[in-house]
Every structure is written in structure tokens, then in C-alpha cells.
């Protein structure tokens, strides 16, 4: 790299550091109550009472801002000092010992397997329940057949009407020449398919009757599966049916939709057409129309200057194009400009990210249903979830005359009336019943959905087109600091531990600005603040050093602690596994943060330190996703300390900035090699094929969110093999999240055991299924979960299969990937993407390979 390039890069990094330094400030606040709450006590942490030391300042008539700068210097010599981490943790060890004892007792008492349980059950009871089950399945089959017959009848009426219109038309010959294809009947979609329902079509060429690519679609050649998707969309349109195009992310739902509108436009129905989408995707829609259908008139109906400006823009557009064309707008504008939108007669309505309409009672779906339109199309890359109410909401939107009553729909599929008595059954019998219900209900619901839902998977239709992708799980054992926080969280002592560590770090890391104070004084100050006896102290009893320390504490730290809400145990544990600095930041001046200190707070950052620099040096571009915006701050600090130039998108980044960053990052000439993204805010409507590496710093409870994040770079347009690194801390709450992902994705090769952790198993696998659409999910207390999480943490073996047994790492080598592991993780050869490879390394497991060779 040239000297000029280096200088430019450093300028970028320094600007980023300066912006973040300005953002980190502290102020004074209310006092804090350090007494620990019960595990399930989720009340606020801030106390309204002030300590006696607070009144000390008032006594002298001066506040923090009026005092001279404080400089600490006590008289404890270094050879007389103590170790800060030498405090007695016997209470924590006692709790852990109780957990181990309970684990041993539970192991000894559980003797029978699920198979034995089932074999000893009363045979007549099992037979009776299975008979009821079969009757229920047949009942739902009847309903599916009724719906199919209704759709057939309706489509035949539309077909007959079209035939009659064509016979009376003077342009019949012209129309037949224009189409040059045989119109396909919707009955074709009711024929039995031998292929898997999810894949529907093969990657072959369409048949002779398929619609050809519209002439107005330019600068691209539709792939065979996209032509087949277009054919399906046109068939629905010609049969008077609405539909859901649910192709997996990255298969080109946008270009297929544009092709459909181009076809309709060529058939002399020139609109107006309305496309509504999330704000973040509007520019992408505009770019796609400009690229693939430049001759179609398109308006981006959006603006922040008020209704008058927007309405004038729309009226001018319609005046210019004779009331035709395509209007693209956001959900927010639909809700704001309802009257203007409703006043138009739209020929076609396309709703992008249609899965957002799953709540029938939300205002958006109510307003969209009021829009005057002849046809509706929903686009979604998220598969339909196993929830009757959500499924019916989508069906009601696209076919309101057929799916008009949820109660009737629910009656045919609600199994509660069967009285199968799941509470009194064995786990084995419940599993048998649930599996049978799921299998048959899904089959029957697919019978209903088959005519107007199309979903193709990348691994099927792009098997020979898209570059391969492989996904690893990397075990990132907690550092000593993280393990201390995690155990404290489980034992109900997180607030106290956070306070102690903040005090220690603040007074040891900022001595350049506040002077030196001994470890003994720090310990005394901690004990003083935690004693609860501050109100009994008088002036002559207070050590002058402690008084000075307390002034610094109130000025710089009190706000930090007061504002930290410790109310959600699961969230606390997940954040601890990312970094302890998510709970406090001890530096007076953020620019003083060192790489060494930052790495001590996070085993995951230690893995990045070993893994990412070699990738950057080889020219790879990396996407790093996190669930937590404040974790993105720390990762950005880590990038700055390594002189990596970064872009960033989270919920606070405006649309124009997003667009500019995406364009630059996807350019091969741009020097930014890492893109930091908030998983939820940046998981949709973003194309980042400039990257070939994805890091999931933490996983989402919904595995589809993580898959969408990967699809930002593993999509059409990607030319390089892709590698995904999923960072995970074994035998912690992340183990539960990973179990959920593996289960939902049906990854049989990745066997993840939950053993005796029944409540954690329920938490991992519960998803509000078809079977209990409106029932509460897992009903266990925090105490039950804490107990099992403690047992999981103390397990001697890894439940995922890592060699080193979860957290039982040697802390001297914690987070250290071996050279062999780094070689495996960075291997881009085609050999590394072969299917069914076995990767057996201490910290690394191969989770999944797609489009494998």
C-alpha cells in the first residue's frame, strides 16, 4: 500500500475515533441501591435516596463542578498493598457446589429412557388418542379439499369470462400474436407433485408453453427458475388470483416482480401500479427498475417536506403519464397519506416484505386492505411460521373473499378439542402425537397454499450458479472477567460485581488524570459503598482518600451505574458473553482504550483478533453482525485499534448514508474492508456482494434473521466462495440459541444435545406451533432457568462436541485458535466446500455447507 493510501486510511480511522469519543460522556444521577434483588425481581435498579457523602458536599455549599481538580495520593506502599482479585468468593462457590450436587442427584434418579416409558403405557389409552388424532387429520383434509374446490370454481369463472371477452374482441388476433403462448389453467397447480413442496420447481428450462421474457425487461436474461416464477405469476394474474412469492432471500423476487409488471404493461394495461416496501428498500427498487425496465415510468413517492409536496409530485407524475405508471412508496407513507392513496384505482399492488402483515389487527394491514386494487402480490423471503393466526392473516390479505372468517379456519385446524391430554402423557407419547399432527397439518395446509404460494430454495435452483458457502461454529470460551460476570448473573449478584469491577478499573486505568490510589484504598472504598452504613458516618470518621474517591465516583461513575438496567436475565447473560464492557466503560478519555484491555473483556474479540487480520491482508471484505448496537461500538473500537477502515449501518443511519456506504463498499477500489451491521436493522433490502466473509458475532433467537444476514452477500451477483463464522460460547445461553437454530433448520448432521436440561430444551424448541397458536409458550420460572443454566455452565463435557469441554479451557490460552484451525477457517479452495466433510477441531465445527461440490 502506498504512503498516500496509508495516510488516507489513517484519516478515515481517526475521524471515526473522534466521533465516538465525543459521543461517550457521563453525568451525575440518582444514587444506586447495591442490594441484590431476587432472581425474578425485575424492578428498576435506581434508588431515590442520597448517601451521607452526598450531603457532605451540600454541607460545604459546593457541588462537583465547583471543586478544584481532585488528585489522589494515599500513603500505602506498594509492598504493603493487596491484590484486588483476592476477595472471598466463597458464597459464589457454595452456590456452584449446590448446583453440582443437584446435577449428580438428577443424573442418578433418571433411569428410564423414553422408549421404555412408551412401552409401559396403557395400550388402550395410546390407541384411543391416536384414533382421535387420525379423525382430526381427516377433518382438516376435508377442509383443504373444500378450499381447493372453491378456488377451482372461482378460477373457472374468471377463465369463462375471459374467453367470452376474447370472442367479442376485435383485437383477438392481435392478442394471440402478442402472447404467442398457451394460457395456463390454475388447475395445473392442483395436480399432484412428486417433488418436495418447498422446492416446487427444478433448475431446468421452462416448458414450451411458458411465458417468454417481456421485451420491456432489459439488461438481463432471466434464469430458468425466474422465468418459471414469472410464468406462475402471470398464470395467477390471468386466473384472477393473488399470490405470495416466497423465494428464499437472494433469488431475485424484485426482478421477477418487475418482469410481471413489464408483461402486464405490454398487454396494454399500463397501470397505475403501486409497490409498497420498507423505507430501507425504496432506493433498491428504484435502482432495479432503472436497470431492468428503464422504459417504464416510475415514481418514488416519498419525501419529508410534507403532504403537499408529495401529493403535488404524484399529481404531476400522473398528469405527465396519463394516469399510468409505477409508484413506489414506503409503509409509513401509506399510513400518512391514506386518503390520497385510497383515491386511486390501482391495477396491481405489490407488498414487499409481506411477512410483516402477519398481525391481522395491525394498522398497516388494515390500510393496505382498503386500497382499491384488482390484484395483490406479497413478496417475502421468510418462510411461513407455524402459527395459524399469522398464516390466516396473510391468506386473508390475498384472498379476503375465501378466507373471511378466522374462527372457521381455526376450527378445522385447532386440535385442543381433541383432549389428547398432553400434560398427563409421557414425553415420548407427546412427541409421537405432535410429530404426527405437524406432519399432517403441514401437508393439508400446503394443499391450500399450493395454488398461490411459490417458494424456491437457493440450494436447489442455484446449485450450479451461486458460489458455494460454508458456515462454521467457533467456540469462544469466556475470559476470566466474563466468567466472573456470568456466574454473578446466575447467582443474582451481577449488579454488585459490575459495581466492583467498574470501581477497580476506573481507579487503576485513569491514574494519569486522577492520581494514584492503592489497591487497599480501592477495596476499602468498595466495602464502604456496599456496607449500607454510609448514613452513620460523620466527617471525622471518613478517610480523606475515600472522600476524594467518592467525589470522583459521583462525578464520573454514578450515571454509568444508575442508567444500567439489569431487568432481563437472558439479555444480561447474552451481553456478558459478548463483552463485559457492555455493562460499563471505565475510561475518562475513550481514546485511552488499549487493544490489550479490550481483548480481556471478550473471548469473541480474541477470536476476531486471530482470524480477521489475515483475511484483511489477503484482500477479503468482511461483514460483522451483532444484535447489540453498543457491541458494534466496541467492535468499531477494535477495528480502529487495528487500523481497519469500517462502514456501519444500524437503526440510526439514514437512508442516504446507507446508500452511499453500500455503493462504496461494493466497489473493488474502496479501502473500507469491514462493514459493521446491526442484525435486525441491516438484515433486509441490502446488497453487499462486495464481501465474501460474514461474522455472526452473536446469534438471533429467530434463525431466519441470521440467514437473511448471510444472504446480504451470498446472493446473485456474488462471484467468490463465501465463508460464515458463527461465534458461540459453549455451555451458556448461546448453546440454547444454537440448539434452536439447528432444530429449525433441520440440520441433522449438526447434533446438539440438551441432555437433562428440560426447561432449556423447551425454551430452545418452543415456537408457538400450529398446535398451540394462541397459547402461552414456555411456562417456567427464572429460577428454573437459572438452575439449568448453572448446571450447563458447569458441565464437564461440551454439548456441541468441542474437544475442550465448553468453559474448561486453560485461561492462559483462552480464545486462541490453533494454526490448523486458522488454516481450515480461511481455506477458500473448492476442496473445502465439498459436501459431507468432517471437521474435528478443538474450537471449530462445520455447521453447514450449501451448494457443496
Swiss-Prot record:
The gene is IRC5. GO terms for cellular component: chromatin; nucleus. Residues 548-580 form a coiled coil. Gene3D superfamilies: P-loop containing nucleotide triphosphate hydrolases, Tandem AAA-ATPase domain. Residues 56-65, 185-198 have a biased composition (Basic and acidic residues). Keywords: ATP-binding, Coiled coil, DNA-binding, Helicase, Hydrolase, Nucleotide-binding, Nucleus. One of its GO terms (biological process) is positive regulation of transcription by RNA polymerase II. Residues 607-758 form the Helicase C-terminal domain. Signal peptide: none annotated. Its EC number is 3.6.4.-. It is an enzyme of class 3 (hydrolase). PANTHER family: SNF2/RAD54 HELICASE FAMILY. ATP binds at residues 247-254. Pfam families: Helicase_C, SNF2-rel_dom. This is Uncharacterized ATP-dependent helicase IRC5.
Amino acid at each position: 500500500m502506498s504512503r498516500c493510501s496509508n495516510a488516507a486510511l489513517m484519516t478515515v480511522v481517526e475521524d471515526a475515533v473522534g466521533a465516538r469519543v465525543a459521543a461517550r460522556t457521563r453525568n451525575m444521577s440518582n444514587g444506586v441501591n447495591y442490594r441484590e434483588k431476587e432472581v425474578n425481581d425485575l424492578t428498576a435498579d435506581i434508588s431515590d435516596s442520597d448517601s451521607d457523602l452526598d450531603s457532605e458536599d451540600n454541607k460545604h455549599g459546593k457541588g462537583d463542578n465547583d471543586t478544584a481538580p481532585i488528585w489522589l495520593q494515599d500513603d500505602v506502599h506498594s509492598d504493603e498493598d493487596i491484590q484486588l482479585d483476592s476477595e472471598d468468593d466463597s458464597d459464589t462457590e457454595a452456590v456452584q457446589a449446590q448446583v453440582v450436587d443437584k446435577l449428580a442427584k438428577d443424573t442418578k434418579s433418571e433411569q428410564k429412557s423414553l422408549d421404555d416409558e412408551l412401552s409401559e403405557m396403557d395400550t388402550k389409552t395410546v390407541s384411543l388418542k391416536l384414533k382421535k388424532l387420525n379423525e382430526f387429520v381427516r377433518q382438516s383434509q376435508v377442509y383443504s379439499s373444500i378450499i381447493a374446490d372453491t378456488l377451482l370454481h372461482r378460477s373457472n369463472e374468471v377463465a369463462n369470462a375471459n374467453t367470452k371477452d376474447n370472442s367479442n374482441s376485435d383485437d383477438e388476433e392481435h392478442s394471440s400474436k402478442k402472447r404467442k403462448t398457451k394460457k395456463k389453467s390454475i388447475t395445473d397447480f392442483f395436480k399432484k407433485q412428486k417433488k418436495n413442496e418447498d422446492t416446487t420447481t427444478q433448475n431446468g428450462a421452462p416448458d414450451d408453453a411458458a411465458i417468454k421474457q417481456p421485451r420491456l425487461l432489459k439488461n438481463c436474461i432471466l434464469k430458468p427458475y425466474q422465468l418459471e416464477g414469472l410464468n406462475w405469476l402471470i398464470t395467477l394474474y390471468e386466473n384472477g388470483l393473488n399470490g405470495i412469492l416466497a423465494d428464499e432471500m437472494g433469488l431475485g423476487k424484485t426482478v421477477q416482480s418487475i418482469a410481471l409488471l413489464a408483461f402486464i404493461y405490454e398487454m396494454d394495461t399500463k397501470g397505475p401500479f403501486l409497490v409498497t416496501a420498507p423505507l430501507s428498500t425504496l432506493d433498491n427498487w428504484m435502482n432495479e427498475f432503472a436497470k431492468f425496465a428503464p422504459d417504464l415510468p416510475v415514481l418514488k413517492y416519498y419525501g419529508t417536506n410534507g403532504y403537499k409536496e408529495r401529493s403535488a409530485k404524484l399529481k404531476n407524475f400522473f398528469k405527465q403519464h396519463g394516469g399510468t405508471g409505477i409508484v413506489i412508496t414506503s409503509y409509513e407513507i401509506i399510513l400518512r397519506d391514506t386518503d390520497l392513496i385510497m383515491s386511486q384505482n390501482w391495477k396491481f399492488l405489490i407488498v414487499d416484505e409481506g411477512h410483516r402483515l402477519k398481525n391481522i389487527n395491525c394498522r398497516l394491514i388494515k390500510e393496505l386492505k382498503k386500497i382499491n386494487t384488482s390484484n395483490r402480490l406479497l413478496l417475502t423471503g421468510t418462510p411461513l411460521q407455524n402459527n395459524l393466526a399469522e398464516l390466516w392473516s396473510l391468506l386473508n390479505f390475498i384472498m379476503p373473499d375465501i378466507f373471511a372468517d378466522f374462527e372457521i379456519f381455526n376450527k378445522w385446524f385447532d386440535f385442543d378439542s381433541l383432549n389428547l391430554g398432553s400434560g398427563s402423557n409421557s414425553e415420548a407419547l407427546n412427541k409421537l402425537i405432535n410429530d404426527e399432527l405437524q406432519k399432517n397439518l403441514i401437508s393439508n395446509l400446503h394443499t391450500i397454499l399450493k395454488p398461490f404460494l411459490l417458494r424456491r430454495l437457493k440450494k436447489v435452483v442455484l446449485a450450479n450458479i451461486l458460489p458455494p458457502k460454508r458456515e462454521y461454529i467457533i467456540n469462544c470460551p469466556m475470559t476470566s472477567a466474563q466468567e466472573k460476570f456470568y456466574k454473578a448473573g446466575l447467582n443474582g449478584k451481577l449488579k454488585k460485581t459490575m459495581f466492583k469491577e467498574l470501581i477497580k478499573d476506573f481507579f487503576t486505568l485513569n491514574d494519569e488524570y486522577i492520581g494514584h490510589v492503592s489497591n487497599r484504598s480501592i477495596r476499602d472504598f468498595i466495602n464502604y459503598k456496599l456496607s449500607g452504613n454510609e448514613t452513620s458516618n460523620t466527617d471525622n470518621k471518613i478517610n480523606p482518600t475515600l472522600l476524594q474517591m467518592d467525589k470522583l465516583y459521583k462525578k464520573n461513575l454514578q450515571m454509568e451505574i444508575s442508567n444500567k438496567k439489569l431487568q432481563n436475565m437472558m439479555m444480561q447473560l447474552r451481553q456478558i458473553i459478548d463483552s463485559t464492557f457492555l455493562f460499563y466503560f471505565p475510561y475518562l478519555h475513550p481514546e485511552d482504550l488499549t487493544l490489550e484491555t479490550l481483548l480481556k473483556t471478550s473471548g469473541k474479540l480474541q477470536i476476531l483478533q486471530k482470524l480477521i487480520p489475515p483475511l484483511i491482508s489477503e484482500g477479503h471484505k468482511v461483514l460483522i453482525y451483532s444484535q447489540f448496537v453498543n457491541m458494534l461500538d466496541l467492535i468499531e473500537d477494535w477495528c480502529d485499534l487495528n487500523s481497519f477502515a469500517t462502514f456501519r449501518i444500524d437503526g440510526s443511519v439514514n437512508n442516504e448514508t446507507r446508500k452511499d456506504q453500500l455503493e462504496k463498499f461494493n466497489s473493488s477500489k474502496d479501502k473500507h474492508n469491514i462493514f459493521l451491521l446491526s442484525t435486525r436493522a441491516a438484515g433486509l433490502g441490502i446488497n453487499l456482494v462486495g464481501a465474501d466473509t460474514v461474522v455472526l458475532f452473536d446469534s438471533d433467537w429467530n434463525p431466519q434473521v441470521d440467514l437473511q444476514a448471510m444472504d446480504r452477500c451470498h446472493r446473485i451477483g456474488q462471484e467468490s466462495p463465501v465463508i460464515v463464522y458463527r461465534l458461540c460460547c459453549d455451555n451458556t445461553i448461546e448453546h440454547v440459541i444454537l440448539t434452536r437454530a439447528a432444530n429449525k433448520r433441520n440440520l441433522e448432521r449438526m447434533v446438539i444435545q440438551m441432555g437433562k436440561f428440560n426447561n432449556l430444551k423447551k425454551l430452545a424448541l418452543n415456537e408457538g406451533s400450529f398446535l398451540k397458536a394462541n397459547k402461552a409458550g414456555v411456562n417456567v420460572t427464572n429460577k428454573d432457568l437459572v438452575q439449568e443454566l448453572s448446571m450447563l455452565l458447569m458441565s464437564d463435557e461440551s454439548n456441541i462436541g468441542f474437544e475442550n469441554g465448553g468453559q474448561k479451557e486453560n485461561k492462559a490460552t483462552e480464545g486462541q485458535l490453533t494454526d490448523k484451525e486458522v488454516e481450515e477457517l480461511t481455506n477458500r479452495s473448492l476442496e473445502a466446500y465439498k459436501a459431507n466433510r468432517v471437521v474435528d477441531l478443538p474450537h471449530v465445527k462445520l455447521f453447514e455447507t450449501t451448494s457443496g461440490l
